[in-house]
Amino acid sequence: MSYRPGSYSVSSMRPVGSVRSSQVMTVQRSMPLASAASVYGGAGGRGSRISVGGSSSGFGSGLGSGAGGSYSSMSVSGSGLVGNEKETMIGLNDRLAAYLETVRNLEQANSKLEFQIREALEKKGPTTRDLSPFEKTLEDLRKKVYDMTMDNSRLVLQIDNSRLAADDFRVKFESEYSIRQSVESDIIGLRKVIDDTNMGRMNLESEIESLKEELIFIKQNHNQEVNDLRNQIAQSGVQVDVDAPKGQDLAQVLAEVRAQYESMAQKNRDELKAWHENKLTEVEVEVIQNTEALQGARTEVTELRRQMQSLEIELESQRSMKASLEDSLRDTEMRNNMEMERYNNMILQLEAELGQLRGNIQMQASEYEALLNIKMKLEAEIATYRRLLDGEDFRLQDALVDQSSTKSIKKVTVTQTLVDGKVVSESTNTKEIGK
């Protein structure tokens, strides 16, 4: 392919932000007949430039590797351009070989970086994310805390039930104690009745004794009077006959009176004895009943007191057990809090290491992306060189054509789309402008 005198420019545009993004290369060709021929190719500020003037021609090539790059130029005269064409092509081939060597080095560095990233992920990735042992330990601790909480709740419920039972027994004890006091007051009243009955019996016995003594005294007086009367009658020796009817015998009358008094006294004694025995029997029965009730109340009070003491002992034991369980629960919670804090610190440390590792991976990915960008730019420049050297069939001899040709401008716009250094699509737009 031959070029007429004119200018030829190649520009490469690539969007930044994606490693696998496509490249769009725009080739613009404008060829004024009387102007000098120039060739410029590059990508991202790095490339080569060939310029040919009317009296002199400058040929320069610049190569950039990395972010900056180097640039070299070479100028030859119009008469010596053809003689130096071979040296220029050799220099370009050397530079192309240097580009290829740089690309191979970058590919090796890229492979090494990928291997380091995979090795770092294999070494540190699973250990930072493998928290299953800690989860099992935490689950066991949570289960122990839950079991202790349930045991504590069960003991609290038992203590409450014991407290309610103790309250019920206390109420029963108070009611039985009031019954006991009422029974004791009744017993005291019955004892007073017994004492009064005994006093009445003693009074009646004393009255009986006094009546017996009075009866004996009356009998003695009566006998004394009878004897005196008999003696008087015997000493007087007077016999009186009375025509009146014979009166009652005095001895018989006295005997009747004596018998009547004795029967009355015996009747009174029998009635008093029967009443006293009946009353004493009733009092003894009532005393026996009250004594039995008192004994039963005393037995029940003793049993209730014994039960209350046993419940108080059990309550104290439950309280001491509750206190010990609360202390154990506090110690367990403290240990669990310390373990949780240690595990949290360990998790934070592991998360920090994971974040640092992610930062390192991200930094290495950024470096890898930068190297990949450089590689793609170099591939674009290599493609430009290949297109300029092989595809376009450029010959430097065409630059020496007579500059006095018809002056016209033909603008050819070639748009190429590159993906990973390969031409995907290409379009050409030609516009001729006359001067």
Swiss-Prot record:
Organism per entry: Acipenser baerii
PROSITE patterns, alphabetized: IF_ROD_1, IF_ROD_2
Stated family: Belongs to the intermediate filament family.
Superkingdom of this protein's organism: Eukaryota
Domain IF rod residue range list: 85-396
Region of interest (Linker 12), ranges: 230-253
Region (Linker 1): 121-137
Protein's UniProt keywords contain Phosphoprotein: yes
Post-translational modification: Phosphorylated.
InterPro entries according to UniProt: IF_conserved, IF_rod_dom, Keratin_I
Entry's Gene Ontology cellular component terms: keratin filament
GO MF annotation list: structural molecule activity
PANTHER family: INTERMEDIATE FILAMENT (PTHR23239), KERATIN, TYPE I CYTOSKELETAL 18 (PTHR23239:SF349)
Name listed for the protein in its UniProt record: Keratin, type I cytoskeletal 18
GO terms classed as biological process: intermediate filament cytoskeleton organization
Keyword field contains Phosphoprotein: yes
Site (Cleavage): D243, A244
Keywords: Coiled coil, Intermediate filament, Keratin, Phosphoprotein
